[in-house]
Amino acid sequence: MPGIKVYPNESFDEAYRRFKKQTDRNLVVTEVSARRFFEPMTEIRKKQKISARKKMLKRLYMLRRYESKL
């Protein structure tokens, strides 16, 4: 779980910004929203398939973009 130490000369806004950044990096909010409701295995596999396809298309796009510059 993320935690920060607030320095004496640091404002609340700065400390809050650091805390938000740390929670975003640790994917705390994403994990909480994912665990909020039960997800059947079929839904998990469906999401994994979609993300794998996105990754593959992104790699293909980058490869074609790189090849066109040669």
From Swiss-Prot:
Molecular function, one GO term: structural constituent of ribosome
Entry GO CC: ribonucleoprotein complex; ribosome
GO biological process, one term: translation
Ranges in a coiled coil: none
PROSITE patterns: RIBOSOMAL_S21 (PS01181)
Similarity comment: family membership: Belongs to the bacterial ribosomal protein bS21 family.
UniProt protein name: Small ribosomal subunit protein bS21
Lineage, top ranks: Bacteria, Pseudomonadati, Campylobacterota, Epsilonproteobacteria, Campylobacterales
Gene name tied to this protein: rpsU
